[in-house]
């Protein structure tokens, strides 16, 4: 009788047992570090446990789940997604796989992969709080709040404290806000180095959205008045618009803002129409049309108006990078037309561990050529180009209020004459009592505007929007 194999197995058993103990010890140490709010140390323990070869499937699953949770805490969302995918592969039953899928959906939502997150949790989120929270986050980003209402009604509210309770409350308020009729008021003011003042006041009412088959629709009306004052004369622009938001299936969205306008005895049609096709999280196409008066006193006096047509794309070569090119054609009723384009490259902000801050970056460029350049009526050189690089900072004051800042510098060239340019902006977004919303923007830029541009030019602006559900 050959006794070599049983003897070999007996010799190997202590080594296997020792390795199992090491993996279990690493997992326990990682869980203890998480409970003690030490995610960096926890990640090291869970990574060490996962690196052990030949570990049991349940240990591999536990280590991967812990590694994903640690990475989420530290803001390393791509690493968290990889860890939760590993946990999915090691899951031993449907409940374990759903827990891994919920963690993966949280990591995907944090990277703005909303469609993938929604598809992941929608099959099982009904009646479960954690996956419902991630489904609501994805639905909010996609504008699919009407689809998510049933999930919210079926979920059991979690305790108010902690991440889950806070997110549930905020997302519930966001859903109710999105599905209710809304009133809106907005105010804007700008002043530039030429003494041109532009004051804007507007109000809007939007009906509650409704769905018919694959069509989701929302309609409303808006009224606006704008005063343009250059210190010598003052002009008023008034308009009334029909507002429309249409969602067709999963991929098509149309936004409308169309209606009549007037300035004194001059009557015209104005507004915007925009179509967007977004088949996935990483690519989309868009097209738009805009018609508006040229916003300077002299241009309004001469009844100058333009039509602008644009096509664009959005591409995500990586989780943190967004590339947005646009081409446009702008036709003025004085016979001038422009061919131009713009490009924005965005680096999604990185969360700074153990703080409420995140830092990202932005590159923006614009170029156009006018076939009939002119001076004195509106900014209209033959050739214009500009490019700026900037830093973006985001600070979460608390879960309900967020501050965003941009500081960019670059250069512009107007008919061969170059000059340095800069842009500084601060925005505040948050919630008001009664589930209202506030958006405040302050900015200063030396880049050319519709009225003027060049060395020494600058423009200061402030915009405020307040919305309330009814």
Which residues make up each language-model segment?
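Gram-negative bacterial Sec-dependent N-terminal signal peptides
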Residues: 2-17
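Gram-negative and organellar
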Residues: 19-22, 29-44, 48-51, 58-470
